[in-house]
Curated annotation (Swiss-Prot):
Function (record text): Involved in protein export. Acts as a chaperone by maintaining the newly synthesized protein in an open conformation. Functions as a peptidyl-prolyl cis-trans isomerase.
Chain ranges of the PPIase FKBP-type domain: 163-248
InterPro entries recorded: PPIase_dom_sf, PPIase_FKBP_dom, Trig_fac, Trigger_fac_C, Trigger_fac_C_sf, Trigger_fac_ribosome-bd_bac, Trigger_fac_ribosome-bd_sf, Trigger_fact/SurA_dom_sf
Listed name of the protein: Trigger factor
Annotated organism of origin: Streptococcus agalactiae serotype III (strain NEM316)
Amino acid sequence: MSTSFENKATNRGIITFTISQDEIKPALDQAFNKVKKDLNVPGFRKGHMPRTVFNQKFGEEALYENALNLVLPKAYEAAVAELGLDVVAQPKIDVVSMEKGQDWKLTAEVVTKPEVKLGDYKDLSVEVDASKEVSAEEVDAKVERERNNLAELTVKDGEAAQGDTVVIDFVGSVDGVEFDGGKGDNFSLELGSGQFIPGFEEQLVGSKAGQTVDVNVTFPEDYQAEDLAGKDAKFVTTIHEVKTKEVPALDDELAKDIDDEVETLDELKAKYRKELESAKEIAFDDAVEGAAIELAVANAEIVELPEEMVHDEVHRAMNEFMGNMQRQGISPEMYFQLTGTTEEDLHKQYQADADKRVKTNLVIEAIAAAEGFEATDEEIEKEITDLASEYNMEADQVRGLLSADMLKHDIAMKKAVDVITSSATVK
């Protein structure tokens, strides 16, 4: 193979490479065997036309496109490897020449990984908005949340107050015309929960069972149903019942109802304190890691980030997100319907910080390379085992989904992150 690389601009260039006859001939044979299956030519049974007859009738050139598709991926990868390039986006391939009996000549317009000039990434001093300390108020708040979860709703006489639940029928209209989705029967609405659009729930405070209230509201400008956004609406609302929460007493019996592993309220609080301390420890470590990585990235210099890398990152993140949704049984169509968003909205969401994610990955990769981090066989096996456990899969399934190179890359990246964070100190 003959290869060359011509630099055209920062992180951009053109590879010129050839595909030899030794590679072309077997590819032409494969292409012919594939094509002839569908050929129906008088004088021959379907799929049994001789190669010589095919060449006479159609010309060998008729096989070139199929043959090129067979040999191109391997030839391109070999050219990139021979030149020692780190290509980061799909190439634009052009054919220079494909003549019978001659090596084929092609060019590939490529984008290469930008140069990263590392700054300080060890012994960094960072500030974090997080604490490991757990206050008595935080413990009490957790107990109170669990206590409220055990609250029972009972029907009450009198006016509905904030926090009460009202059982209602409602019919919505705009300019006197009812609209789709604006009607409900026997709907339980907790006042102050924010379930309905702003202004709705507040107008039911003070209402009583048996009353009908005209609730006048304005739909938000960014409301998901565009035909209603920004419009004034009236909901004729009938209150059937008003219910209030009755929470159990704050005592040892409550503690046992919440957690059958404790006997007293003090034991429950002690258990919650440990849980909160553990969660805060993790959150604190995550905050330190995030701040240290952000500072290491800020200290580095990246020469012109290719837009193709950002584009690919947006689509990678979107595909990963939608894949997670589908594993939960939620199709893209269902997700967009439930959230009132579009694919374009999701694209904008991931576009917002795609630059930052790409730069972060580039800097961490550069640190891994600078430190000479590599993955051992034992580390690869442990990574496979950990992933299998995390996603409830068999180890062989993980091996089938992730190549050894991907696993090695991920392990090296984790080591680089550890170098950054383990030496960082908090101001």
